[in-house]
Amino acid sequence: MAGTPAPNSHRKQSGGLEPFPGLSRSIENPPSKRARSFSETTVPDPEDPFGEHAEFTADDLEELDILASQALSQCPVAPRNLSSAHKVRRLDGLPNSPIRKSREDIPVKDNFELEVLQIQYKELKEKLKAMEEEILIKNGEIKILRDSLRQTESVLEEQKRSHFLLEQEKTQALSEKEKEFSRKLQSLQSELQFKDAEMNELRTKSQSNGRTNKPAAPSVSHVSPRKGSSVVLKSEACSPHVGKTTFPTKESFSANTPLFHPCQTEAGHRFLVGQEVSDNKNHSLGGSLMKQDVQQRILADGWMQRKDAQGSILINLLLKQPLVPGSSLGLCHLLSSCPEVPTGTLLQPPGLSTLPGTSGLRTISSSDGPFSPSALREAQNLAFTGLNLVARTESSHDGDMAGRRVFPLHQLPGAVHLLPLVQFFVGLHCQALQDLAPAKKSGVPGDSATHTSCMSSGVEASPEDSIHGLESFSVASLSVLQNLVCHSGAVVCLLLSGMGTEAAAREGNLVQTCADTTSASREDAHDQDQHPLLKMLLQLMASSSAASGHFQASVLGLCLKVLVKLAENASSDLLPRFSCVFPVLPQCLGSALPLPCVLLAVELLSVLLDHDSLAWQLCSHPEGCLLLRLYMYITSRPDRTASETQWLQLEQEVVWLLAKLSVQSPAPAGIGSDCHCNVEAVRALTVMLHRQWLTVRRAGGPRTHQQKQTIRCLRDTVLLLHSLSQKDKLFTVHCVEVLHQYDQVMPGVSMLIRALPDVTDCEEAALDDLCAAETDLEDSEMDCN
């Protein structure tokens, strides 16, 4: 019934809202109080299923409700409401029953429930949107917290790693220091044992000398060492310590030993030497006793000097054994060399008993001349006097140098008396090299005087072996000269003057002589003659740089060290005297030389550039440009035995040398000039900048002192490149050969320097210009292609 509509439903929908006939009649004529019975039989109207005069039953009303609900579900809301309104009017005449009320409340109830559902739907939709927004917010907060947690974990992990590395480095450093301290302790203990044994031996010798030399000569006045009389030492100086069975300490030995006068010591030495030389039957014993007496005298002089004596440091350095690592010779060997004894009994250093150079030392100087035995003996006597004067003289420091040095350089005029001994051995070496040079050219090894003398003495040795032996004495002499130059202002003044060592030794007041030399150098430094020892140094440098070998490199390095210290301690008025060094320096920058020698040559140039007249000689001499040779040595790196740290040190010295050269006014040659070294400077600076940047980038971790110096050198190199780019019009063309390195290094160096806390505006401007020049380089390379 609900699926098929009633027969008259079509009529009701199509014919509009027409009232039922029975219902209208009942409304017009209200029914009687007594209802009709349902048993009355009436003929139903086929068109009216409810009957014409019959009342609606509950089934009819239910059917009407069903029809109305179907009409409401199929028709729009407005027509349904209209039909409902008509139905209400049609049913107004019905009695007030519960069925009628339920029928009237159905549409209102449906509308109300629909509105309630719509309101609830809207509220739920809004709540859903709010929940979605809240979920999105919570998800974002969770993501942010997760990222911050991950970042915090990474930071903590990095801190743990850095802390672990730092602790590991500290532990390693402490272990290395502990090992070093233990090694030093062992070496000091062994040295103390040797000193104890030596003290015991000296004590025994002093007792024996005290017994044999009881008659003492009276003391004499202080005269020149060349005119002093031959006297013996006082017996009190070597008297045995009676009643002392224990080993004496340094303090007790110095306190109980009387203070010698320098002249007495020298005279006593001459007496002992005369006795030993005159005794032809005991040459071997005499040579050994001479060495022991020399060691005893020097050690006693060092212990007996006053605490405030300025020469104590110099004495300790001169008594070091050996003077040079790798060599067995010291000052004692130079002082005890006696060319008059036979070869078998000649005093020789340990391990050099068959050294032909030692016999050459005896036989080369057999005739009269500057290398005669008498000249050696006289030089040794002067050296003894000089040691005594240095140990006891309180010297004043140089006033001119006091303003330039943190620790003023003291005069120590007694140190000048050691120069003849140094000059003897260095000159002997130079003479042997001169004699060997024509023999090498002619191919006849017997032409040299050294070889002839050695063969005549019965020792078969080649000239090369003789030169090798003389080189060891020359190395020891140069070490003595280096110590003298480092601590004596009188030696510095004398070497830079035109006066010879012997002439200076004859002067009464050596300090006044040095002052006169300084004042004369201010007037005309170039017209004075060179000191003979300085000429020998330059000759040794030239010969050693041309040869190859360990001893040649050692001799060249010592010569350069002496010149560096001599230039550092010289006053600005004496620096023009070093103009004689520039013709030899190109040979010291050759590709065959080791890196330490080249580094010393760069240090010497850096000191000499303090004077403007010397700075102009970098590119002016005919042997070649010094800067060009230096650039080629750095870019090629010929010394394969040098470490990376040594190469970085050389590059830093070169950068600082160029920085000093660039700030001089007026600018000398080499920076922005027409010399070919200016073209090579761009390439060399780019290569050095690239290497140093790679070193800093590979290091990582906390920066050490060496890395900080490398960064400082990077900054100076950038400023130098910027200066070259401003002065050189063809800067972009000169950079084409190293364009790949320039493109790689400039962005990294720019980021590194800009990240520093103390970066300057000048450096930032230089980086901007150099990075802008990078694009110009790319354009020029494209044009070349």
From Swiss-Prot:
Q: Which GO terms describe its biological process?
A: DNA damage checkpoint signaling; DNA repair; nucleobase-containing compound metabolic process; regulation of double-strand break repair
Q: List the disulfide bonds.
A: none
Name the coiled-coil region(s): 108-209
Post-translationally, this protein is described as follows, namely:
Phosphorylated by ATR.
Q: Which GO terms describe its cellular component?
A: ATR-ATRIP complex; nucleoplasm; nucleus
Subcellular location field:
Nucleus
**Motif segment (EEXXXDL motif):** 763-770
By sequence similarity, the record places it as follows: Belongs to the ATRIP family.
User: Which protein is depicted?
Assistant: ATR-interacting protein
Native organism: Mus musculus
